[in-house]
């Protein structure tokens, strides 16, 4: 079976997003397009042409409700599956992925954990009520984020800073693998949950990134707008402009042609004939 083209990957991911959107609407769960997908919605009214995945974010209370819903309705959601470390012990990330199991994904340099074509779901937690508090808070899990990345890698790679730094990196890699990704994911999640999303002025996906530019004012996320994305409409934060400028700067100007490449480095192919037939038709349903 042939690998999916970029456009076929986008079509498949869009179908997954439509399923997720239906669940969130039915259950009254807050979510919105995020990161590069949000740029795509504003700048291209769909995918960034060279992007190869979809990102959404959810306040932690809604994220928890989605996880509970997907576990309760596991059988009827098939072939869709929500991936977390508690649902799949081989899973290696503190975010969730809503995955179509009729496909198989193979990352370059990442351990195989049975992922299908997917949509990333980023849980948003509180970061504090002042800029100083939020900046300090978001830095705290940096070590655990690095350990999680060690657990996700399919093999050790020497330090890019030279051979003198490689032994220390190898020791950290071995220590992380000894404990396993679940240990660090549970620890970083317990840390992130200490600050209540609903009570903090600043929020962000602190289990995923430790940079200040991914921390936002909660008021920017409180209201959502529905905007065109490909052949459907999905919610985005009403404060999207300030958010995107905070993270990306001039997000409305595309990068130069030589930088217009996907960032995730994976291949996808259908495991089932039905999935393959969908892409032969070339239709977004």
Task: Please give the residue ranges for each predicted region.
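Conserved catalytic core of two-metal-ion nucleotidyltransferases
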Residues: 1-25, 70-129, 148-249, 253-285
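Active-site nucleotide-donor binding segment shared across nucleotidyl transfer reactions
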Residues: 21-54, 58-64, 219, 246-247
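Charge-rich, low-complexity amphipathic helices
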Residues: 45-47, 60, 143-144, 265-273
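Conserved SAM-binding loop
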Residues: 66-68
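A short secondary-structure junction signal
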Residues: 131-136
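Short, His- and charge-rich active-site/binding loops that engage polyanionic ligands
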Residues: 138-141
């Amino acid at each position: 079976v042939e690998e999916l083209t970029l456009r076929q990957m986008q079509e498949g991911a869009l179908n997954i997003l439509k399923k997720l959107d239906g669940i969130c609407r039915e259950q009254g769960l807050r979510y919105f397009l995020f990161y590069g997908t949000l740029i795509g919605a504003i700048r291209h009214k769909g995918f960034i042409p060279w992007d190869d995945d979809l990102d959404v974010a959810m306040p932690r209370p809604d994220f928890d409700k989605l996880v509970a819903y997907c576990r309760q309705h596991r059988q009827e959601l098939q072939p869709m599956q929500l991936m977390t470390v508690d649902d799949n012990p081989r899973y290696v990330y503190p975010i969730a992925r809503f995955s179509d199991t009729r496909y198989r994904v193979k990352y370059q340099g990442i351990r195989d954990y049975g992922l299908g074509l997917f949509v990333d779901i980023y849980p948003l937690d509180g970061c504090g009520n002042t800029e100083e508090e939020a900046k300090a808070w978001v830095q705290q899990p940096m070590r655990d984020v690095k350990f999680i990345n060690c657990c996700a890698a399919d093999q050790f790679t020497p330090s890019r800073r030279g051979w003198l730094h490689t032994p220390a990196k190898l020791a950290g890699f071995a220590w992380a693998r000894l404990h396993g990704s679940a240990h660090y994911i549970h620890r970083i999640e317990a840390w992130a949950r200490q600050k209540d999303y609903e009570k903090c002025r600043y929020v962000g996906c602190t289990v995923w990134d430790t940079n200040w530019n991914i921390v936002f004012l909660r008021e920017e996320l409180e209201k959502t707008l529905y905007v065109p994305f490909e052949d459907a409409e999905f919610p985005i934060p009403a404060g999207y402009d300030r958010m995107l400028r905070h993270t990306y700067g001039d997000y409305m100007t595309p990068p130069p042609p030589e930088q217009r490449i996907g960032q995730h480095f994976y291949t996808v192919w259908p495991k089932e004939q039905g999935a393959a037939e969908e892409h032969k038709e070339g239709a977004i349903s």
